[in-house]
Every structure is written in structure tokens, then in C-alpha cells.
Regions:
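A recurrent flexible, glycine/aromatic-enriched loop bordering the glycosyltransferase active site
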Residues: 142-160, 177-178, 235-238
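Conserved donor NDP-sugar-binding/catalytic core segment of glycosyltransferases
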Residues: 97-129
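Short, flexible, basic/aromatic active-site loop/helix in glycosyltransferases
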Residues: 117-118, 132-150
Length: 369
């Protein structure tokens, strides 16, 4: 008999998501409980969902204040009694056979510590969502389709053995709205077990576009807040890289301001700004042609804005919140295997070189005028 506790922290408390989760097919000889943690005291719990709470198979916990998904998951872990814990977000629609898929994987591979599947987004509906796909910022949501194993997985769709969790919990230092806490949690488990999570490309949940696909960069700024905290917790997965577009703009515009004062002209600032921005978009366009094809390369502008918003959050955290000056050009290897660092450095170096070259070209052009 396999026992599974499904832990769902919920701020939204929407029946359209919660009910399909607790109505997933339960395989034979599998004992499943659903632990829902209501994390929004100001939101009334829907009656149609409340009628399904029996405090045996469907158990509802209510936070007295909004604590965030990470602390809410800890409530679930503290009350979990099952052999396995399945984390699901409250804004996904799981495939009907999700638990069956995980149960079969557990039976086939009882010695593995955990498994994770894909979180699938709809087809892009506008230029912004096409840019999200093009820039690869969502890679880890569907990485189970083309990776074999990984040290961590998004908590939208991952199951892990309870005995391997032990006393490990989601750290409270991470932002309430999310970012980095899932990486930290699973890396703690990896440090303890030295075993990675196995990928299941047939374990699927479906996620709608945030804000219905409307342009919004706050989420990606916020992600980097939490990610930046990982640098000091897991320094073995950090590395230095060439300045990104936001770092280059910040320091380039700062130093060019002295030339503006000296020349009594705003021209140096404009030259630096144009050189960096044009270089970034040009190289990103070329990169996308090489790896994504001409069709997706037209969304290089959109993808660059998304990545830049993420870089803004990272620079703010390093310099303002954490006051880590030496962390400015520091990056976190999210694959946690150091296999992709060389690739990242090559493209970052090409981009940084383009900033300098295009700035010089613009300067010489204006000088001739």
C-alpha cells in the first residue's frame, strides 16, 4: 500500500482549481489525502469546495494571516503522515491520472527519493507570452520532458519520499510571494541524500498564463529576489560572468555622467545607452535565430525585456538589500551541475563585447558629424 499526502497551499481559494485536484483518479491500493492550506484570511472559502472537506481524505488548514506558499507548505509537512508527499500549486489543472503516474513510478523505482513532471503552459497568445517562451525563463517548468534527473524541481508538480524530507522545511527567509524557496528545499535534500529527482514526462499539470497573459514583469523581478539568497547558501553553485545588460547600463550610465559634466553635454550618456541597448537586442536576435529559428527570433525584444526585469531584481537584491558588492556579477547555476556555465559565459562575453563595439561605432559616427 502506497500512501501519498498531496499538499496544496492556496491563496486564491478557487473551486475551479481545487476541486479538480482533489478529484484526481486514485489508483488501487493507494491511500491519498489532500492537505489544503488556506493562506488568505480575507478570502471566503467557496461552499462547493468546503462541502468536500471531510477532515479525513480532504483536510483544510487555515492560516490566521497570509504567510506565503513556502510557510504554508511547512504546515502541510508538519501534518503529513504519508510515505510520499506530492506538492501541487493551487493554480494548476492536473491530468486526471497524475497520482496514478506517480504511483506507478514509485512501484517501478522504490529506491528513488522523488519524481517530478511537466508544468505545461498554453500556446502563446500574444507577443508577451511568445517572448516568455523565447527567452527560456520558463525552462524548469517543462524540463522533465528532456532531462533525466535534476537536483530540484518546481513545487507545482513534484513528489518526494517523506523519510528523505525528515526535518527539512522551506526556509522562512524567502519572499512570501515565492522565488528560490523550492530550489533551496530540494538542494537541502540533495545534500542529505546525494540523490537526484527523476523526471517523468508523462506526469503533467497544466498552468494558465499569469494575469491571463497580460504584460507584467513584477513576477520575474520577484523571482530573482529569492534566487539571489541562494548565492550565500549554496556558493558551490555560483559563478562569475560578464556584466549583463542591466549591470552594464547601471555602471555605464553612472560613469558616463562624469563625461557629461566634463563636456557639458548629454551626448556621452546617450551614446553609452544606445550602444548597450542595441548590442543586447542585436545579439539576442542572432542567438534566437541560431537556437529557436527565425520565427521565434522576432520576439527577441520581448524576451530581452523579461530577462532584463529578472536582472533588475537580482542587482537590487545584491546591492541594496544584501549589500553584497562582490555579488554584482555573480550568477547562480540553476542546473546545479556546472555543465552550462561555459555556454552562458560565451554568450555573455559576446553581448558585452557588442556593447563596447557598438558604443565605439556610434561615438565615431557622431564625432564625424
Amino acid at each position: 500500500m502506497i500512501s501519498i499526502d498531496v499538499i496544496i497551499p492556496s491563496y486564491r481559494l478557487q473551486s475551479e482549481y481545487l476541486i479538480p485536484i482533489i478529484q484526481m483518479d486514485i489508483p488501487f491500493e493507494t491511500n491519498v489525502r489532500f492537505l489544503i492550506i488556506a493562506d488568505n484570511p480575507n478570502e471566503k472559502i467557496p461552499e462547493d469546495f468546503l462541502s468536500l472537506v471531510d477532515n479525513q481524505k480532504v483536510i483544510l488548514f487555515s492560516n490566521k494571516e497570509n504567510k506565503g506558499a513556502h510557510k504554508s507548505r511547512n504546515v502541510g509537512l508538519d501534518n503529513s503522515k504519508a510515505d510520499w508527499v506530492l506538492f501541487i500549486d493551487d493554480d494548476v489543472n492536473p491530468s486526471k491520472n497524475l497520482i496514478l503516474t506517480y504511483a506507478e513510478a514509485i512501484i517501478r523505482n522504490p529506491n528513488e527519493i522523488g519524481f517530478f513532471g511537466e508544468t505545461i503552459f498554453p500556446k502563446p497568445k500574444n507577443n508577451f507570452t511568445r517572448g516568455l517562451i523565447a527567452c527560456d525563463i520558463l525552462t524548469f517548468f517543462f524540463i522533465a520532458d528532456y532531462y533525466k534527473e535534476l537536483k530540484w524541481a518546481p513545487t507545482s508538480n513534484v513528489i518526494i519520499k517523506n523519510t528523505e524530507i525528515g526535518n527539512i522545511r522551506f526556509k522562512e527567509i524567502f519572499p512570501k510571494n515565492g522565488g528560490g524557496e523550492d530550489i533551496d528545499f530540494f538542494l537541502q535534500i540533495y545534500d542529505k541524500t546525494k540523490k537526484e529527482l527523476q523526471c517523468l514526462n508523462n506526469a503533467k499539470v497544466y498552468h494558465n498564463w499569469w494575469y491571463n497573459g497580460k504584460r507584467n514583469y513584477i513576477r520575474f523581478i520577484r523571482w530573482s529576489y529569492g534566487d539571489t539568497l541562494l548565492h550565500t547558501i549554496f556558493p558551490q553553485f555560483t559563478y562569475y560572468n560578464f556584466p549583463n545588460v542591466i549591470e552594464s547600463l547601471t555602471f555605464g550610465l553612472f560613469f558616463s555622467s562624469f563625461f557629461c559634466i566634463y563636456t557639458k553635454s548629454i551626448i556621452p550618456l546617450i551614446i553609452i545607452f544606445l550602444g548597450i541597448v542595441i548590442g543586447e537586442f542585436l545579439i539576442e536576435f542572432i542567438r534566437m535565430i541560431m537556437y529557436k529559428g527565425l520565427k521565434m527570433s522576432v520576439y527577441a525584444f520581448e524576451g530581452t525585456l523579461v530577462r532584463a526585469s529578472n536582472d533588475i531584481g537580482r542587482l537590487y537584491m545584491q546591492t541594496v538589500r544584501l549589500k553584497r558588492i562582490f555579488g554584482i556579477f555573480e550568477r547562480f547555476d540553476h542546473f546545479c551541475d556546472r555543465k552550462h556555465i561555459k555556454h552562458q559565459r560565451i554568450w555573455a562575453g559576446i553581448k558585452f563585447s557588442s556593447y563596447i563595439i557598438i558604443t565605439i561605432i556610434i561615438y565615431n559616427f557622431i564625432l564625424k558629424k
